[in-house]
């Protein structure tokens, strides 16, 4: 359990400092005339380079590579979860200009005709990796760092790891609207109100015409060589020859101003005008030739551009020598910009700017003092900004930068804000807006529905499918009942229909939608969450609300506000398997499980995206959301346990019903499962979640939905299913609206009145209206279970539900029984609970084994039932008694292990020996680690990760090997170590790109080093 200290930040505020004209959304900000306060704080430095490139366009990558070849140290950060955002994000892949193949990068991408997004993205990844250039995805710039002489000295970026500083001598701004140059104080023309011209590309649709809407069908069709089979097993795809027409629409959209809210609405208008039920794909981004150009050091007025001789000062802001604008926002004529914005045309300019930026950096000394300037304004909303400022990883921080106290603009005020438009978030926005609340839903993706749509899990696996979920399923099906794309059952769907269904439901109810927005923090006053701090492509600000619904899936906003949370740490490395799928147009179900991914660790997310493109390099495209089944979870007023689920616990404040088997995708940790494994996939459990489990302890004005809710990790497999979370989100949206209308804090809404409404639509069974808490079980019931437990562990869930009284009843029965077999049952249960009562019986039972029984290897997809053998459980139970007398017995079997032995046997030995913690256990563990193939599975860098990751979409070999090495190394370290091998393994994994291994290894080193160190939040 962690508590993230409440950090009062000041970052994006400086993004709004330099000049009143620094932001495209300045008009909207001026009208609001409200600001939020950020106290002084320190921003961790993640990178210190010569050249930082902001943006992941083709030209941006070309600039980064050329700067590196010129001797500069370079870092690049992309806005999207991929590189090539100028062509892949806008879907502008078509070109007739052969001159773009004059550059090597252009030739690789376009030389063989119309490229696939996968080819573009992977080519750009490899261009940076091959040149040893660090880069990240999904990060927005929020601030400019300023040197002691007042010049730009780098940037601050924001992502799901928080905010980090990047110190740099020169900046290449390759964002479409030159947002970094604007932050640095560069001057731009005016973005006039009225009709503005945008372009938007879709795939598979019928050509439409309407006032202000014209379209052209590209001559060359999109060709798919593979099609998804929709199966979890096998490769998941088959060979095919499928072709789609692509349409580029030109749209005249009425823009109120150049504010972010205007651009967000423009995207929704474009989708309103172009979507139809035959659409199989669409661009993420609107394309516009920016009308408000940079005021540069030079002006290019000609229509034609000579790529070799155009003066680079056209791309430099006036009076700012170390910033370049590498986009259509440069000081170009409209015709010249239009020419350069054709796919690939800017590559050569990027190369020239990269070389020049490196040369300028070579003339500049490193700044001794770098900071983020603040600005004070009036009309401040009381409160302060809470955010996560731990760096990409604490161990990688390269110092800190002071961010002066400042103010952030209020970008909007709503009754309800939903941060995250995924499985629970989109329904929450529907629920709130349909109740009449002024609602805003924000999402980093450019579509709603989360894992069930963009995440490519387009069919249900179990789940409570009544209630609001049934309304959704029927609504999606009825969008076009006779369309041949229609699915056969309500349990699966056309992914873009569901995305569009949620979008229309929210807009029809009056709700607002902002895509392409990161939630980076919370605005808090005395424990009351008053709004969400957001990073947009145009800068950073605050959106205020009466109630915030945190549907990020990782409790990002709640944790930023100060909530405690649980995740992998020094005590636990258990996490459900994850994947990242390929994505062809019209795919709806590409379920993968080949790794672990920590969504909140941007290095890990980056690693997963890079590797996934290698695994699926022949496919049309890669997914945009990691398929994670388990994430960090906040600590709420109540935490749902495994035994609450197994015992059918009822609550007076039930908010959602959940129906599923224990789909664990890996091994479990709760002692109950070590004794009585989860049932097979066909055995479903009906479980309930109380409203208290969605309310972060100690905070008001916020509720958390989905995977970020307060529950033990082993309970999550039952309560994470999509149908259940859709119902949950809708209910919480209703609750948030009611809280506003009654001027209440959401914690105190009339839950019984809400339950009645949910019962009416069948989201909840009627009995919840009269349910009371059925915990704890009576002692009489526990005693009865203690007698029956000897019969195949009958009643074990009752005994362990109330652990303290359960131990008492078990101990009594252990001493009363004269039956040796029964005595062993009690001894095994008590041992698992850390009680030493039956240690002799456990040792005797283990000694009856000459060799190992049938064990278990790590399994992700399709993992049900036991993850340890009976002998494994005896050994773990013996170890947990902490009796040293068990060591010879455990070591005897440890010496029989071979590299081919099952993973569960290694894990059992490790847990037993490390729990006893005696130095006698060290050498046997060392001997195991010295066996061939047991060590050497760390992935410290991306090239190693690419080399070690097999191609299969459900690979488990890397996890079996890495987990085995890490768990054995941990146990060796905790037994006192041998030849420093345990320490070495933990240190190696503390640098692993895979976030959960990093967290675990780092946590073990901190918790068990015996040395007092500065506390670092992991």
Map each language-model feature to its residues:
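N-terminal export signals
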Residues: 5-27
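Conserved N-terminal/central alpha/beta ligand/cofactor-binding core
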Residues: 40, 66, 72-73, 77-150, ...
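Amphipathic alpha-helical scaffolding segments comprising HEAT/armadillo-like alpha-solenoid repeats
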Residues: 773-784, 803-815, 835-859, 883-897, ...
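Flavin (FAD/FMN)-binding glycine-rich loop and adjacent Rossmann-like elements that form
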Residues: 37-43, 86, 98, 114, ...
